[in-house]
């Protein structure tokens, strides 16, 4: 069934446009409440934990969700600004029936979204998303409203951030501290602006803060994981040992070495995988990544006796593959890194701490750790579009794709996909000659831009 509300990572759109309107959002809360009541809830009176990032529209979305859940007899516990992985943690820690994070992740402030976690701390299944969509769009939910004393209540939880800070710090071995390390930390003016500095400072690091002054409008604005230049420049300027750049909801991280060189999710995966294998802590000597990861990752991991399993894009797909086969490390080039022994979803702070652990254990600088991976030249073009058609139905698409594959002569690849969260077509081309693959990628992007606008 084609998704009508949910994309690759929850519901996401410009605030006050479908489906992120107060009416639809309230119905999402009602639908979730109805499903929680239908299945035996954990609590006699069901409860849901709700957090958010720092967008202006977060207040509106929070009120609409709360209204919908309360009207179905579900108690709501509001925890305020907190990273996405923090809600996964709190759903379990607080024995809630579900958790919701209000965020559009790396998108600009005018967008917002909803991600839902089950009582186990993992994002809900595609099947449950389908059920919510059917209830919201095709069902009269008012027939199921709670009455009288069965209505839900709402209260604010003041110590949620502190609980999550302790949980993150538990991902870092007790035998190490971060004393002696100067860390540039960019919080993207987002959900981690209080939590992340506390974590790194309490572990002993000297922290140089960027992106820690949210005003409702500046989340991800030339800051954070999508704009690592601020971090890299600060690393060089302040002679820092490492840079850590989170996105708006802190479920992804991009790092920088002491020279200001960007360390992306592929590098982070490779460094963590080899370290865990050396320690005998990498089940089945396998990691999970997506089709967007650089092919150099596969070759490097093979040289170290590690298998790479690839999935469709989205950390939810990565996590599902990990859980299905018992793997504990996975992630995406974009910086969603999942350490399943500790977190239920991508956690930027946890991923960064794992790399800092390797630095401490090995006594090496991050540039030394990352130097063993030589990426194949890769070009990614994001093309704005107005509609999404089946790719093979676009006139000229199949012929051009075949031509590009022929031009690459088996030494590269082309991958074309739609974003699941934005109106974008993504064109990725890899090959030995950067100028050549850039021309090929632009040729495909131009075709899509012309055909889909």
Where does each model-flagged region fall?
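Short glycine-centered, acidic/aromatic-flanked micro-motifs in structured strand/loop junctions
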Residues: 51-53, 185-187, 257, 341, ...
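An N-terminal, well-structured beta->alpha segment
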Residues: 1-67, 71-72, 153-183, 393
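Active-site nucleophile and cofactor-binding loops and adjacent substrate-binding regions
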Residues: 76-85, 262-265, 289-290, 311-312
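Phosphate-binding and adjacent anionic-ligand microenvironments
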Residues: 242, 279-453
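Gly/Ser/Thr-enriched, mixed-charge loops and adjacent short helices
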Residues: 14, 112-238
């Amino acid at each position: 069934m084609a998704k009508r509300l949910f994309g690759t990572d929850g519901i996401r759109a410009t605030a006050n446009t479908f489906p992120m309107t107060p009416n639809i959002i309230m119905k999402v809360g009602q639908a979730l409440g109805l499903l929680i009541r239908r299945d035996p809830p954990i609590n006699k009176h069901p409860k849901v934990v709700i957090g958010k990032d720092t967008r202006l529209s977060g207040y509106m979305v929070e009120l609409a969700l709360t209204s919908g859940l309360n009207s179905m007899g579900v108690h709501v516990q509001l925890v305020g600004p907190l990273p996405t992985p923090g809600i996964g943690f709190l759903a379990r820690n607080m024995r809630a029936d579900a958790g919701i994070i209000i965020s559009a992740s790396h998108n600009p402030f005018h967008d917002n979204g909803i991600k839902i976690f089950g009582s186990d701390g993992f994002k809900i299944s595609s099947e449950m998303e389908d059920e919510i969509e059917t209830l919201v769009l095709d069902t009269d939910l008012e027939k199921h409203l709670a009455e009288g004393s069965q209505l839900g209540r709402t209260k604010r939880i003041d110590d949620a951030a502190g609980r999550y800070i302790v949980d993150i710090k538990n991902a870092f071995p007790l035998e190490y501290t971060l004393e002696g390390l100067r860390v540039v930390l960019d919080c993207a003016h987002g959900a981690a602006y209080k939590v992340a500095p506390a974590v790194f400072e309490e572990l002993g690091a000297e922290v140089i803060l960027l992106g820690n002054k949210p005003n409702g409008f500046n989340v991800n604005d030339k800051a954070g994981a999508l704009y690592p230049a601020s971090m890299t420049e600060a690393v060089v300027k302040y002679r820092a040992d490492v840079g850590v750049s989170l996105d708006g909801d802190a479920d992804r991280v991009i790092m920088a070495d002491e020279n200001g060189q960007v360390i992306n999710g592929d590098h982070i995966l490779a460094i963590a995988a080899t370290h865990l294998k050396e320690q005998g802590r990498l089940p089945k000597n396998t990691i999970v990544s997506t089709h967007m990861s650089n092919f150099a990752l596969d070759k490097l991991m093979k040289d170290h006796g590690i298998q790479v399993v690839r999935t469709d894009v989205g950390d939810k797909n990565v996590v599902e593959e990990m859980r299905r086969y018992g793997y504990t490390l996975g992630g995406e080039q974009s910086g969603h890194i999942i350490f399943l022994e500790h977190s239920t979803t991508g956690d930027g702070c946890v991923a960064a701490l794992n790399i800092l652990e390797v630095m401490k254990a090995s006594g090496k600088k991050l540039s030394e750790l990352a130097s063993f991976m030589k990426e194949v030249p890769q070009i990614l073009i994001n093309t704005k579009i107005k509609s999404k058609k089946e790719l093979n139905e676009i006139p000229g698409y199949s012929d051009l794709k075949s031509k590009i594959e022929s031009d690459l002569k088996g030494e590269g690849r082309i991958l074309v996909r739609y974003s699941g969260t934005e109106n974008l077509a993504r064109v990725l081309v890899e090959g030995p000659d950067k100028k050549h693959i850039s021309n090929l990628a632009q040729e495909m992007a131009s075709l899509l831009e012309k055909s889909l606008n």
